[in-house]
């Protein structure tokens, strides 16, 4: 898949698997939007690593559990770059439940 100059949004893109995806997409020539919710320093570090390697990236904050944050993030990317070509839905929404209440695991979030 040719990703050269494509706009790639990686949710949770500053740490773990998201960071690896961000780095690989940038290595292949994508312009990477590194999303973070609370991990700003890690996202900025990932952007810096990409830029030092000759790639293009920027950090963008949004809590993916909040629809308004997601809409604002997409609008900001579209306003700046015209589109989002690639989406890596890496970030997750977690909810802690008691181990003795497995019924709670089947409820909708």
Curated annotation (Swiss-Prot):
Pfam family, one: adh_short
InterPro entries reported for this sequence: NAD(P)-bd_dom_sf (IPR036291), SDR (IPR050259), SDR_fam (IPR002347)
Family, per entry: Belongs to the short-chain dehydrogenases/reductases (SDR) family.
Protein name per its UniProtKB record: Short-chain dehydrogenase/reductase homolog YusS
Native species: Bacillus subtilis (strain 168)
Name of the gene: yusS
